[in-house]
Amino acid sequence: MAKTFQKEYYPGIGKIKFEGRESKNPLAFRWYDPEQVVSGKKMKDHLRFAIAYWHSFCGDGSDQFGSPTHFYPWDSVADNDEKIKMRLDAAFEFFTKIGTGYYCF
């Protein structure tokens, strides 16, 4: 994975894999096996998951009822170019680890 910074945003978490329904690993797929063939197509072709970049990495979790609920490392960075690079690094690290092939706005 190409990085613009030398930082891992989700340390200690490897690629999320299918481990089956008996798995006790909270960071494993129990039912979704991307390579399993269902009705002639792989599951990953039936279920094309996408992560909403803006909503997942640019917001602060606030809504009309209250204050922000989460804070990211890049929130406190003053330089906008650096902030954008950090946000993109974190997003693509997440996309890679969870194994989604798509992202959207």
Question: In which residue ranges do the predicted regions lie?
Answer:
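N-terminal pre-domain/capping segments
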Residues: 1-105
